[in-house]
Regions:
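Metallocofactor- and cofactor-centric catalytic cores in central/energy metabolism, strongly enriched
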Residues: 6, 31, 61-62
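Mid-chain, well-packed structural core segment of small domains
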Residues: 59-97
Length: 119
């Protein structure tokens, strides 16, 4: 399964903790992530992570295209509900819209991510 990881700056540590806790499950899948999140997860866990461009360089658009072409099976987006960045919020909403359009499961917080990863 192809799983994509995205995390706002204030949620990157939570994404690392999630990936560490579920490393044995995630290691059986192909992981990809936006640039900074992917590097941090790979460095902390040793899991191989393919990197998309950074958010500001079009990383979300790359992910959206992969979702549209059915190349991504699941997306974890750990968002900061207190972030005040309208552009970032629009990118997240577009990615969620793509997931909904193409029937790709998406988790936007730790509880929903655990439900998806545990099946």
């Amino acid at each position: 399964m192809n799983i994509t990881l995205i995390a706002h700056d204030k949620k990157k540590e939570l994404m690392i903790q999630f990936c560490t806790a579920y490393k044995s499950i995630l290691s059986k899948h192909t992981l990809s992530a936006t640039a900074t999140t992917g590097r941090m997860v790979a460095d902390a866990t040793g899991l191989p992570v393919s990197l998309f461009m950074a958010r500001s360089q079009g990383g979300y658009q790359q992910i959206d295209a992969r979702v549209a072409y059915n190349e991504i099976d699941m997306v974890f987006i750990f968002t900061d509900p207190n972030a005040n960045d309208p552009w970032e919020e629009q990118c997240i909403l577009q990615t969620i819209h793509q997931c909904d359009t193409h029937n790709v499961p998406v988790a936007t917080n730790l509880a929903s991510a655990e439900m998806l990863i545990l099946g």
